[in-house]
Amino acid sequence: MSKGPGPGGSAASSAPPAATAQVLQAQPEKPQHYTYLKEFRTEQCPLFVQHKCTQHRPYTCFHWHFVNQRRRRSIRRRDGTFNYSPDVYCTKYDEATGLCPEGDECPFLHRTTGDTERRYHLRYYKTGICIHETDSKGNCTKNGLHCAFAHGPHDLRSPVYDIRELQAMEALQNGQTTVEGSIEGQSAGAASHAMIEKILSEEPRWQETAYVLGNYKTEPCKKPPRLCRQGYACPYYHNSKDRRRSPRKHKYRSSPCPNVKHGDEWGDPGKCENGDACQYCHTRTEQQFHPEIYKSTKCNDMQQAGSCPRGPFCAFAHIEPPPLSDDVQPSSAVSSPTQPGPVLYMPSAAGDSVPVSPSSPHAPDLSALLCRNSGLGSPSHLCSSPPGPSRKASNLEGLVFPGESSLAPGSYKKAPGFEREDQVGAEYLKNFKCQAKLKPHSLEPRSQEQPLLQPKQDVLGILPVGSPLTSSISSSITSSLAATPPSPAGTNSTPGMNANALPFYPTSDTVESVIESALDDLDLNEFGVAALEKTFDNSAVPHPSSVTIGGSLLQSSAPVNIPGSLGSSASFHSASPSPPVSLSSHFLQQPQGHLSQSENTFLGTSASHGSLGLNGMNSSIWEHFASGSFSPGTSPAFLSGPGAAELARLRQELDEANGTIKQWEESWKQAKQACDAWKKEAEEAGERASAAGAECELAREQRDALELRVKKLQEELERLHTVPEAQTLPAAPDLEALSLSTLYSIQKQLRVHLEQVDKAVFHMQSVKCLKCQEQTRAVLPCQHAVLCELCAEGSECPVCQPSRAHALQS
């Protein structure tokens, strides 16, 4: 039980190097791993044949039920090669019937249900960590007991390599170049690498991220199936499940189509009646290369191995954020996500047609995400670039296509393999602290006492609307304002200034002194992950007033759901070309509510020093206050006026709407429970009706049988009544009273019956014993048959002795 299923215990026929020969030895396998590698889905379930298997729906049985679920056992032969490739799929395999013209001898991978031949191959089974959580029993919360990925270091196993792959790895380590040959004769990583390099040399535009997003897997492959490696290494599609509709021609959301994807499996896109006009994703390729999800999360291969076998065709981000230090390099020195680099394509357990688990993405860095969305290579661009047309000059400008900003916010799931809360919180706080260092101080001349103020304003500029950090800062600023002692009014004070401000203090200096006092008390370490989670939850709720900024509606569809991720990612993902933006002063200019004159003065003067927000526009911390991120400790001086009343009314309406939605959800749950109960009762009633119908049919058959029997008895009775029978003779005096014809009739009947009686008597005498007249006659030794066996033992034959016969007859 300790040996792997592969028999590769002997060396290859051509003596390989020592390192290769050592690896070719059969590695020990854990008993559970050995069981799955050898027996999982290789035999048909005997209970399913008897219609007794309880693990059919949902299908969690250890054995296969239908032929297209059958898995061939992967074996490494004595020559060091696998019995079928772990990477190249067979083009003749019928996924519906599970049949291949070459049968089990086919050297290519069969795309069985659940892709079990690839996932449970010696090359990939349990070689990567699962991205999903582990329950109390140690099983995967997503894939259950049969998860093909490891849940912990104790569950990991070393991959079994093909001899050609080992030779390619040794040649790569020795600095030798791999001899070019056919794709089928190369290892998985070497063949993919060679094919990608050839494609990039033929079409250099594949190195551009925007070109990949717009054209990857949108055109059919023109090469013969045997000459193309297929999968991720080829940017063209080979079947309907590999095809991707171009987002430039077709507008569809990032959510999977319910008619195509059932559970975790992607079915045939032809099952959707809408075809290419469907508004949802039909393949995994369409979902992972959707503009809302593409490059939104980090590549796990880059983080763990430092290389990715998919190269420019990877749907996940490869660029790490620049090192954060006091001496920041200029933005031009930071590489762009589209710049090609020396990438080593090593064999990986990544998916063949799509980059899936165990090459799962991890948490995206906030600064890297912002730089990616804005098209800049460094966070310094985010803070120092002025607003205007220059912000649109992005290397990812073509990633977002028209019509996507009208999608409903927060209505879709997140990308596969999204980050966990602890990772997001750590990265989020880390970038908050470092943005102040990265912020240049070249907006306008400042005194020596102001350098500390600018980074703190930058921190406020990058905080999302409704963030607990913003609320705490607003509370601190309000407290500082309230703690400032009133100053005597002067004659030179501006009409819009506070009456208590000193006349020789400029308005901007007054506001900056307040901000500096408030931010001195701010410690970013005091804010934990819980506060950030609340920030993300609050930022995902759309504002009921549907405020528009720059003419575009703040609506988007969030990426697909990721196990173990935050509840919402609307702050990180946006369908608009620009990154998420905070509410600008446009919201303050609504005709329903204007702030007081003194507050407008504060807002106007602070805007002159406006720090750049996430959208790159001049904005100040007062915009966060105006957008509804007030702290409970905010001074009433900032909440006075019709604008504050309007905000309070809108907030109340939002709370009421949320309460109504919760009530509707509860009502819907109750109605669903009642509907399920009614459905169950209806099913039970139907079963009872079926049983009653069967009983009724049986009773009807019994009734028909009884009626037939009664009918036969009646016919027999009628026949007996019509047949003339011997009648009992009346008494002698009565005979004289009868007519002569009646007497003749009685006489005739009696003669007939008498003849019948005589015949019966003669027949009985001829077969019965002459002595006892009960037993049947038997043949005596004298060959006479006149007595029975019992009587013949004690009497002599009456025929041989006539006197005896006469005596018997008398």
UniProtKB/Swiss-Prot annotation:
Keywords: Coiled coil, Cytoplasm, Metal-binding, Phosphoprotein, Repeat, Repressor, RNA-binding, Translation regulation, Zinc, Zinc-finger. The modification Phosphoserine is found at S240, S374, S378, S385, S394, S631. It comes from the Eukaryota. PANTHER family: RING FINGER PROTEIN UNKEMPT HOMOLOG (PTHR14493:SF36), UNKEMPT FAMILY MEMBER (PTHR14493). The gene is Unk. Its main location: cytoplasm. Residues 643-727 form a coiled coil. A zinc finger (RING-type) spans 766-801. GO terms for biological process: cell morphogenesis involved in neuron differentiation; in utero embryonic development; negative regulation of cytoplasmic translation; neuron migration. This is RING finger protein unkempt homolog. GO terms for molecular function: mRNA CDS binding; ribosome binding; zinc ion binding. Residues 1-24, 239-265, 478-497 are annotated as: Disordered. GO terms for cellular component: cytoplasm. Sequence-specific RNA-binding protein which plays an important role in the establishment and maintenance of the early morphology of cortical neurons during embryonic development. Acts as a translation repressor and controls a translationally regulated cell morphology program to ensure proper structuring of the nervous system. Translational control depends on recognition of its binding element within target mRNAs which consists of a mandatory UAG trimer upstream of a U/A-rich motif. Associated with polysomes.
